[in-house]
Amino acid sequence: HRIIYVFLISCLAFSISLGKFPMSISLIGLFLNWIIELDFKRKWKKIKERRYFPLLLAGLFLVELFWLPLSEDLLIGLNVLRIKLPLLLLPIILGSKDNFQKTEWKAIISSFFVGLLISTFWVYLVSIDILPTKKTSGTIRDASIFMSHLRYSALLSLAFILVLFLAIKRWANNIFCLFFLFLLGFLIIKFSTLKAILGLFTSLIVGFLFLF
């Protein structure tokens, strides 16, 4: 089950930049694998060892659930809950499992970058009108077809931090790191908004605080 677990986490990392549907499939697979594994006593022990922090994170979803009756549009509220369901499942699933080993981290991070490379290539083709888009705002935001422009910018900022992390930890080839840094820099400039730039600098500051 450990191999399946790491595979599904890698699938989730791969699909983060490719839209809600593949992410949902990966999340459902993770949840089913977690249930089929059983051994809930050991999982609860692991959560207690982490001072119930996974449950605290999962509680953020319950806050959304609490506010649902106060929503002006119940259908919109239910859709928001569906989108934020990972806030409930992922902390419990990840928090009840053993930490990832170095090789597992490499597989997960590599999957994230492969997915990001595919999505950025797709987005770039949309931005130069080779591929169509369903959005009609007439701005560069239309190129972000897999998610909102703001979320895509945040994802690019996260990828920038990950590349720096890989370079510092020497988990990846220097040529790979330079390639992705130039690619991400180009994309951030091309799709830049004030929020994207602020998000990048905020991510850099937070990332360096954790790295050093």
Model-derived regions: residue spans:
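Membrane-embedded alpha-helical segments of multi-pass membrane proteins
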Residues: 20-40, 81-93, 151-160, 198-205
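Aromatic-anchored transmembrane helix interface
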Residues: 54-60, 74-96, 107, 111-116, ...
